[in-house]
A protein has these predicted regions:
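Short loop/turn segments that flank or connect secondary-structure elements
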Residues: 1-140
Length: 140
């Protein structure tokens, strides 16, 4: 299938601004393996992790948002993630989510908030297709 980026690719370079992690409503879906890794990183058991950091939405588990819509693991002052080493796939793939790679309007909408989109490193179509076809990515 051809997308608007099929010939030229897309540019992205993380600006470490934290905008992808807060400031507007959203969800961060997690798998059982991701939850186990995060709990281990935090030094707590899986049950304590679920009770303190998770919410169930649409039959799936998402990280909790704070009242200002920041991810519970975003350190707002430094714009850094407290669980960066073990962050969920959804966070690792941003902005290369299927929902954004298949919708130019969606990509452009997020680019209004993310300083790194359409800037920096060029991701060739071959790489973008790999992101799009990751088995786990279809759940994002």
């Amino acid at each position: 299938m051809d997308y608007w980026w099929s010939e030229s690719g897309l540019r992205f370079e993380c600006a470490a601004c934290g905008r992808c992690c807060g400031g507007s409503p959203g969800v961060v879906w997690t798998t059982p393996a991701e939850r186990a890794n995060i709990a281990k990183e935090l030094g707590i058991d899986a049950m304590a992790f679920r009770e303190k950091y998770m919410v169930r939405l649409e039959g799936k588990c998402s990280l909790i948002e704070l009242e200002n819509y920041d991810c519970i693991f975003l350190e707002r002052n430094s714009a850094r993630c407290k669980i960066y080493k073990v962050r969920p796939l959804q966070c690792r793939l941003f902005p290369f989510w299927p929902s954004l790679l298949t919708d130019q309007n969606g990509w452009n909408y997020y680019a209004n908030f993310c300083q790194g989109m359409n800037q920096g490193k060029l991701y060739l179509p071959e790489i973008l297709n790999k992101f799009l076809n990751l088995p786990a990515a279809r759940y994002l």
